Amino acid sequence: MRSSTVLYVLGAAILAVNGVTTALISDGVDKGSQEQTRWLRSNAMEHETDDEERVLEFKLPSSISTWRAERFERLESLEKQKEMERQAVLELVDKYAPLLLTDRMFAGFTKLDQEGIPLPSMIALLREHGKDITSEMEAYLINSYKTTHKIPLELNTAR
């Protein structure tokens, strides 16, 4: 081997050893960089207690948070309104089902007229909410209603 090659290899080896020892000895920790960060992370977690844990909070700009709050309130009020309407419909069904589906249907017709509820919509509500109304019963109710209110025969065929 030539002397220049030997010097070249020897210089490269010295530089490599110097770089490795500098990296391992920095900060008095004799570990690799990944192991060092792992050690620092675990060491930091040992010193924190449960009530000192840091929670990162992302705060929205006030305009966005106000918009979201208003939207939530609108949705909540719509849900309350729908629930109130549903309760009102169920009360109507419970009120008129015994009248219309028994022999007291003419009293039911009178009450429907007083409250301004059309008979076809009441029949649809009764059917929708689980009351057993056959098509014959529906036709009988409609015909009885039309004859009670003296609606002309031409309108009896139309629903």
From Swiss-Prot:
Cellular component GO terms, alphabetical: extracellular region; host cell cytoplasm; host cell nucleus
Span(s) of short sequence motif RxLR-dEER: 38-54
Transmembrane segments: none
UniProt keyword annotations, A-Z: Host cytoplasm, Host nucleus, Secreted, Signal, Virulence
Chief subcellular location: secreted
Subcellular location: Secreted; Host nucleus; Host cytoplasm
Signal peptide bounds: 1-19
Secreted listed as a keyword: yes
Domain of life: Eukaryota
Family membership: Belongs to the RxLR effector family.
Function: Secreted effector that completely suppresses the host cell death induced by cell death-inducing proteins.
Domain notes: The RxLR-dEER motif acts to carry the protein into the host cell cytoplasm through binding to cell surface phosphatidylinositol-3-phosphate.
Protein known as: Secreted RxLR effector protein 50
Species of the source: Plasmopara viticola
Lineage summary: Eukaryota, Sar, Stramenopiles, Oomycota, Peronosporales
